[in-house]
Amino acid sequence: MIKKLRGRFTTGRALVTTLLILIQLVWFATVFLNIIDYSLVLDALLRVFTVIMTLYLIRKNENPAYRMSWIILMGLLPIFGGLFYALFGNKRPSRRMAAQVANQVAKDYGQAVSGAYPHLLEQDSRLASLSYYIEQTSNLPVYGDTQVDYYAAGELALEPLLEALRSAERYILLEFFIMNPGLFMDQVFEVLAQKADQGVEVRVIYDDFGCLTTLPSDFVAQMEAIGIKCLQFNPFTPVISLAVNNRDHRKIVVVDGKVGFTGGMNLADEYINEIERFGYWKDNLIRLEGPGVWSLATLFLDMWNAFYPKKDINYETFKDDTLSERALRLANPSQGFVQVYGDTPLDNEPLGENVYRDMLNIAQDYVYIYTPYLVISYELQTAMTLAARRGVDVRLMTPGIPDKKMVFRMTRSYYRPLIEAGVKIYEFSPGFLHAKTFVADDRLASVGTINLDYRSLYLHFELSAMLYEHPVIPTIKADFLATQAQARQITLADTRNTLTGMLWDAVLRIVAPFV
């Protein structure tokens, strides 16, 4: 079944889509330039419109770097700048998308119940305040009695993931940004097909843009034909639209509501180092077992019910009553706490960024960070430098071999001020680092899908699993230190730049919020 997916015009679809968008851009530009040549009035109106958009942006409550980039662009392009911002500058999803998700989340509110918060508050009021903020923003509570296993590489997670899928008796939920047929995806979908044939309910969500060059356009039909319900999130069409910005970057696997997985991994062979793309691919995944899995299921079901044509989900049928009872009584609070949360572009609350900033503010001893990209706001940069200046051991690890050279150049442009403030920066020499992880003080960690870049922090649907006072946290710290032994520490001498290089970095900083 999976073999049929390979080589079926996926590259052709991406090429045709790109060409059609370019044709539209050229057509719009040609029409406007020709009209402007014959209309001084239109020229003046467009310039006035650009001024109005600039004033609107100045007063808008939005990320300062994002606003400044657009203001500079509109200053350089006084005729078309305002029009470009009107077409492409709004970070919010389409009204239809916003309404679909907001309505579904509103219906779901109150589904999740947990008795863990008072116990966390008793153990550590500062961690509890962060947990409270997350619950108030995402509607997902903190849970206890949830076992967490940490896999420090994709190939280590493969067999536990397959074993969990094989154990399914009621349902499997699977959501990924990228799915690319190969050994990894083939093995997963062979199990899914077998389970669907056995009567297990199987549902799959994939992001269409993430899979534009890897899956055929009839993938949904192929899955439905073998009993797997499938949702193509935000289909990518060759029409100029703001909606293309908002992607589903989450990674979720849930089995029977009892076991769940999340982390940085997608369903592609490079993630398990079956193939080599940019040297060794360093990623991670966590396995949850217990009441905390319900939040992963909730995020999946919210997305499904918001966008699937048939509203066919009753949340109660996906719950495990035994785990719900455990969530309320919390038999063993000493085993730590887990809180999965989702971040969305539907509001003006950059939840993921705020959580990262608060982790840096909470830390007293150390904060170790994995990130594939470093294209951050001034506020997050300040949180890192302030933590380092008050004596916290802040260490940041990025790839040694990049997947996107321009973004890697942007990443390195942030090194110098961080190093000057005392942040230690390492580049993973063997290859590409794709994990998105914070760990602090042996009592707090975050493992999920949220990169340190503008798209991840402001535009995408994301998730992360917060771990409070959990026994797995030292394992995450140990993984960072072991990986650090394979990395090269960056010094101030490494960040020296020529005048041309500094000018180029300045230009890249201007476009950073768009990347």
What residue spans do the PLM features occupy?
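Catalytic-core elements of nucleic-acid end-processing and repair enzymes
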Residues: 436
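Thr-Gly-centered strand-to-loop micro-motif
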Residues: 370-371, 398, 428, 447-448
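Internal, well-ordered alpha-helical scaffold/interface segments
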Residues: 361, 382-385, 395, 412-416
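Histidine/acidic-residue-rich catalytic or RNA/ligand-binding cores of hydrolases
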Residues: 379-381, 408-410, 440
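Helical hairpin unit composed of two closely spaced alpha helices linked by a short loop
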Residues: 373-395, 399, 404
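N-terminal localization/anchoring segments of enzymes in phospholipid and broader phosphate metabolism
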Residues: 1-354, 358, 362, 402, ...
